[in-house]
Amino acid sequence: MKEDPRHIRISEFNYPLPDERIAKFPLPVRDQSKLLLYRHGEVSEDVFTSLPDYLPADSLMIFNNTKVIQARLHFHKETGALIEVFCLEPIRPNDYALNFQQTEHAAWLCMIGNLKKWKEGVLKREMVVKGKPLTLTAERGACHGTSHWVDFRWNNPEITFADILEVFGELPIPPYLNRETQESETYQTVYSKIKGSVAAPTAGLHFTPRVLDALRKKGVELEELTLHVGAGTFKPVKSEEIEGHEMHTEYISVSRNTLEKLIAHEGKAVAVGTTSVRTLESLYHIGVTLLNSPDATEEELHVKQWQPYELTPEMASVSPVDALQAIVAYLNRHNMETLHTSTQIIIAPGYEYKIVKAIVTNFHQPQSTLLLLVSAFLRGDWRKIYDYALAHDFRFLSYGDSSLLIP
């Protein structure tokens, strides 16, 4: 790595984002969103259905097939009755990123277990988050079909809703439901399969069966991996320099088949979303670890936050193919079909991309680690595309428009 980004000031990645530019709702037809095109320094636009026109026929497009599941919150009434509250969709604010960053108050559409025991009143739970005592309350609002509006409030302005979910939320679906919950398809990608995320990988929300069919007809190969999106994805950067920001750990799974496709399509990987980017780039560093320590344990394969910036010149010279082949060899030795590990990687200016050659992604919040990732990919040219998007009525954040970035 050429540079160490630890002393980058997050204020350098700020831009004005008026509230009216944040998409409050998805479009009725997903693939009719606008598509900003950044190709070799030039910016233009089209509609998302035209995406296949801008990709070479021999590209390998990688999707994150994680499926959003409800965060489960437990409360006990004074009578002792257990109430389970499942967060289904953010309501106020209705953008995932903004909702997770709320302090003191957030509203969600929730499914409620043991509803008959919660006819009225405010649920309360005392808890400790980041070493700080906190009282979380939940108040039931209007009914929407089988779900209810729930207002969450807490009494510590230093704690975000993401912090609460990470400590207080549980992911598994309770067995007593004995059925699929009524999910809002708005929050799932059409190719979602593996349950485990508390938020959707939103870049994938633009894809429809007809866009996927058009990509296949073009000759683009489609492959999948899994990174479960945690609430920590939306953790705001509060330190002046990014050295003071601790990245969240996320769990990843990549099959032997996907690894072999990446090897066969060297230099042609198109990542759908920043979660796919982080997973693919983490694979390189996992491979480098295995080349140096072939008997590394699953825990030792975890990619630490600053690991990419601490490589020796010899380690940094490992080719992407050699790194990927080292993972395949590891799977062979252990008679495994899928790599399961975790990553805490931070991708920021100074990072040298090893595997990803193009990215499909939405427009991200000011002063976010996702914006750092985009800046690193475009070698600092992010302002050009964000200025264009703001000037040409693009919609921002989770429900916003898309972009195809090819440096």
Q: Model-derived features: where do they sit?
A:
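Surface-exposed, charge/polar-rich loops and edge strands
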Residues: 1-407
